[in-house]
Amino acid sequence: MDWLADQGATVDQRIDLLANRLVLIAPRGSDIAPFTPGDGTSIATRLGAGERLSVGNTDHVPAGIYAKQALESLGEWPALQARLASGDNVRAAMALVERGEAPLGIVYQTDAEASDGVRQIGVFPDASHTPITYPMAVVTPSPSAATETLRQWLAGDAARRIFIRYGFTPLTGD
């Protein structure tokens, strides 16, 4: 949305519609005990010799960028930077964990909840990374009635229930 505004697009009625969380995952059948990243338990100590932490590429994949921020914030980055298995997107990173090729991964909560092959073993503190939000705005100078109807529906209770079912946190609603 910021990029559109920077390019000169009219961005009106902007709201942050949804939020997501960053979670630590393991393969569904893993015996790794749940823990909260940042509670004093190191992620690096949960990895065996030669094992890697699966993340989206930390240079250009949004989930990977958030993962790097969280690991830096929690003081884990130096120990884990060389032990990352980088995926081209968050679903590729999750697939490495689903297949057991990586014992741990960092993905969005919504992706983890959509997979039968992984389980969440921890949630990163919200303060450890930039907020993960999904904005909505009208980007035309003269929005149609259909645009306004859709905007209102997306911010309403019916959409809110759907978003919650898929793991999002609605930031607005009736």
Model-found features: residue ranges?
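Exported/periplasmic ABC-transporter solute-binding proteins
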Residues: 1-174
